[in-house]
Amino acid sequence: YREYYISDKDYYCYRKGVFACHENITDSNGEQISNPYFADLQNGDIILTLSIHSLGWRHGHATIITDAEKGIGVQAVMVGEKSTYSYTSSWMKYPLVAVLRPKNVDKETRDAVALFAQQNLQGLDYSLLGGITSGRNAQKVPRATQCAHLVWYAYFACGVDVAPKSGLIITPKDLLHSESLEIVQVYGSILEV
């Protein structure tokens, strides 16, 4: 099983929106398939992929799990769309996926973060510059966000900084390489991208 999780997968790329391209895994016949499952998802976990790119930049995407039992998270998707819920099953199609969990953060805090995200971070406008105008010390919910900033803000609002070394714009790669987060599960060679 280990080899399946870390091996590279065949994939095809399709355009979503004006600039973004999404990679989906395929079988040997070119048919879309899914990774088997996520192990032990918990509220507050972060799922991210680096299988999304725009104009040559592999920026990726991230979501925060708000109801692990039902497989639901909250995400900011793209310009022109409001942040909304997502199903974890939609993340199974990507060839490069990681599940992250904050180090030294108890279940009670992660549950509070999930509840905060569910109640406060849906319906926000999307902004590529999410976080710049509100800053890293914002005390109120931002009006606009992007995927990694939404994840970061959910934790930050509850007293935890999951990307303390990131710059003004928090990216999925900042989350992936954050010393404050541990890897729970990976699909593909995401750590080599």
Language-model features: locations:
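Activation targets extended, charge/polar-rich intrinsically disordered C-terminal tails
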Residues: 1-19, 134, 139-193
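N-terminal accessory segments that precede or flank the first globular/catalytic domain
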Residues: 1-75
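Glycine-rich catalytic cores of cysteine/serine-nucleophile enzymes that process amide/ester linkages
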Residues: 41-104, 131-142
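Secretory-pathway/luminal and periplasmic proteins that interact with or process carbohydrate-rich
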Residues: 56, 123-126, 160-161, 184
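Boundary regions of SH3-family modules and the immediately adjacent low-complexity/disordered segments
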Residues: 75, 80-82, 86, 108, ...
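Long, low-complexity intrinsically disordered regions
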Residues: 98-156
